[in-house]
A protein has these predicted regions:
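Preference for long, well-ordered alpha-helical segments
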Residues: 115-116, 206, 226-245
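Positively charged n-region of N-terminal signal peptides that target proteins for export
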Residues: 1-4
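Short, structured motif recognition centered on aromatic/hydrophobic residues
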Residues: 66-74, 83, 103-104, 193-201, ...
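A short structural micro-motif
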Residues: 75, 93, 106-113, 202, ...
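Acidic, glycine/proline-rich low-complexity segments that act as flexible tails and inter-domain linkers
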Residues: 21-65, 77, 84-88, 92, ...
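Glycine/small-residue-rich hydrophobic helix-like segments
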Residues: 204-224
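Winged helix-turn-helix DNA-binding recognition segment
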Residues: 95-100
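Bacterial N-terminal signal peptides
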Residues: 7-16
Length: 259
């Protein structure tokens, strides 16, 4: 029932802009399943029967992975009202506090600093309620994971050749900050970084970027089935149009890799 109420809150806010979602009269409006039944009983039924009871129990992704996909979508869309519930659920399904911290940090670069800072408050409150202290989140500058020099050299050459002459600053920061630093931070596995990146891109309708990030994700250990199931899961949180925009790109990548 708690997940149902939180899901209803998140689906309610998905239709609001980020600015609207921050207005007190919206952010403070709690919706119980009973509230929804009084207005849209079918909506409450779909949420309970299809999303809560069915989608979250599908075998294609673990509950932990579904939690990562969901919190990535909420951060990407700056939907702060349901975050406390879903951060708590993430902890309950096996996501570590340090991994939540790293998801927030990671998505600052893929969804914007403002979205990341908006998630800090809800995460702080959940951590406080759970007795999670600063010693359980990653340090600012940990020893980094080893870099795949060949793969990074190929990526840097391609991006530099396309954009380096016109946007040298973006190209340099992409190399120095993202792929030689952020992606190598050890407290969120590369596979999970890819999962939350792909989820955030789909949530924000930035599907052109999937041509790069789905192959990276598969190289990092995501399977075709897991990516397909993440897209299925996201349909309920970010809308069918966003996933239908992503599906042709994902399908094309899957087919090319199978050749």
């Amino acid at each position: 029932m708690k997940r149902l109420a939180a899901t209803i809150a998140s689906l309610f806010l998905i239709t609001a802009s980020s600015a609207e979602a921050q207005q007190p009269n919206v952010a403070g409006r709690g919706l119980s399943p009973e509230d929804v039944r009084r207005v849209a009983p079918a909506l409450e039924k779909y949420t309970r029967d299809r999303l809560d009871d069915e989608v979250w129990n599908r075998p294609g992704l673990t509950p932990r992975d579904r939690s990562l996909v969901t919190i990535a979508a909420l951060i990407a869309r700056e939907l702060t009202l349901p975050m406390p519930y879903y951060f708590g659920q993430a902890l309950d399904t096996g996501v570590k506090p340090g991994e939540i911290s790293e998801v927030i940090t990671h998505l600052a670069f893929y969804s914007g600093l403002g979205n990341a800072f908006a998630a800090v408050g809800p995460a702080r409150d959940v951590f406080a309620q759970r007795g999670i202290g600063p010693d359980q989140v990653p340090q600012a500058s940990p020893p980094l994971l080893p870099l795949n020099e060949a793969a990074e050299a190929d990526r840097a050459t391609r991006v530099g050749g396309q954009f380096g002459a016109v946007f040298p600053g973006v190209v340099q920061y992409t190399t120095d900050v993202l792929f030689r630093d952020l992606w190598l931070r050890p407290d969120l596995a590369p596979r999970d970084r890819s999962l939350v990146t792909i989820s955030a891109l789909i949530a924000n309708g930035q599907v052109a970027q999937l041509t790069g990030h789905i192959p990276i994700g598969m190289n990092n250990g995501l399977t075709q089935g897991e990516i397909a199931e993440a897209i299925t899961h996201l349909a309920f949180y970010v809308g069918w149009p966003n996933v239908f925009s992503a599906m042709p790109i994902a399908k094309d990548i899957f087919e090319k890799r199978a050749r």
